[in-house]
């Protein structure tokens, strides 16, 4: 496990080279939560209701904004207001995967206006290094307007059965991240990837990529579509900094109670991991 994962969020925030990652760790420490809720609902009312009810217990809300049947200005302004009210970040799980010119327009232009409201986005590197370069270029442009308030996670691994995000794909994800550290804040992965070495890159002392792990569910081991779940304790134990839980929270009989349970288990696992550090 990367040595950075043994440090507290406060310690990592104090020295983190990425401004958004620094803010995220500060939020996690202040609220005592490492939970990201995946709010896979289909209407603006459901999304904003969940964000408001669960906001006090989460560090991040993850959206799939293109599944909303009624996306509008109300969606954007509502999410932004609730993120400010409850102090959480917004992660749009868009999984950009196209040529650079196209993803730039998808991110900063177009109907969904993602750059306007999503602090965090993610991408697959299947198109090659150009996708990371293109998104980083957009975020650093003089007219972008959001600067250090935006960051990218590279989809380096997946928790679904038979995932092809392994081996050289994962290694290349780390290579590309190291070239764009100001914008790439970390990975969606099942473990820390900071110690990955390749022919073109190697770890540096100041490197501290944030790990988001999907497929966290307290009461289920999987579904019929290939998803494989793990518990908050097992995910944090393997090196996750932030756990992503979806149906285990939003589809629970009492989503607020479920969010509190994930918060408790995730935080206890984090404290056990960092020990006396």
Swiss-Prot record:
Q: Name one Pfam family in it.
A: OMPdecase
User: Which InterPro entries does UniProt cross-reference here?
Assistant: Aldolase_TIM, OMPdecase, OMPdecase_AS, OMPdeCOase_dom, RibuloseP-bd_barrel
Identify the Gene3D superfamilies for this entry.
Answer: Aldolase class I (3.20.20.70)
Q: Which reaction does it catalyse?
A: orotidine 5'-phosphate + H(+) = UMP + CO2
Disulfide-bonded cysteine pairs: these are none
User: Entry's SUPFAM superfamilies?
Assistant: Ribulose-phoshate binding barrel (SSF51366)
Q: In which pathway does it act?
A: Pyrimidine metabolism; UMP biosynthesis via de novo pathway; UMP from orotate: step 2/2
Active site at which residues?
Answer: 95
Keywords tagged on the record: Decarboxylase, Lyase, Pyrimidine biosynthesis
Q: What protein name does the entry list?
A: Orotidine 5'-phosphate decarboxylase
What organism does this protein naturally occur in? Aspergillus kawachii
Give the gene symbol: pyrG
């Amino acid at each position: 496990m990367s040595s950075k994962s043994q440090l507290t969020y406060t310690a990592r925030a104090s020295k983190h080279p990425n401004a958004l990652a620094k803010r995220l760790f500060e939020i996690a420490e202040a609220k005592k939560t490492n939970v990201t809720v995946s709010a896979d609902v289909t209407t603006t009312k459901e999304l904003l209701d969940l964000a408001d009810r669960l906001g006090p217990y989460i560090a991040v809300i993850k959206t799939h904004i293109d599944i909303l049947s009624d996306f509008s200005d109300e969606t954007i302004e509502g999410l932004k207001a609730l993120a400010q009210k409850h102090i959480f970040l917004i992660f749009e799980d868009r999984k950009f995967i196209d040529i650079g010119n196209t993803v730039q327009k998808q991110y900063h232009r177009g109907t969904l206006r993602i750059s306007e409201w999503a602090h965090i986005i993610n991408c697959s590197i299947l198109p090659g290094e150009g996708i990371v370069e293109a998104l980083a270029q957009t975020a650093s442009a003089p007219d972008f307007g959001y600067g250090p308030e935006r960051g990218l996670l590279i989809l380096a691994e997946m928790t679904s059965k038979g995932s092809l995000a392994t081996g050289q794909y994962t290694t290349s994800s780390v290579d590309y991240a190291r070239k764009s550290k100001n914008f790439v804040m970390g990975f969606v992965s099942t473990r820390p990837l900071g110690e990955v070495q390749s022919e073109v890159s190697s770890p540096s002392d100041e490197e501290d990529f944030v790990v988001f792990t999907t497929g966290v569910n307290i009461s289920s081991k999987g579904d019929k579509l290939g998803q494989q779940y793990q518990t908050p304790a097992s995910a944090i134990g393997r090196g996750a900094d932030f756990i992503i839980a979806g149906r285990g929270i939003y589809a629970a009989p009492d989503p607020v109670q479920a969010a509190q349970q994930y918060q408790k288990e995730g935080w206890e696992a984090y404290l056990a991991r960092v020990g006396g550090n």
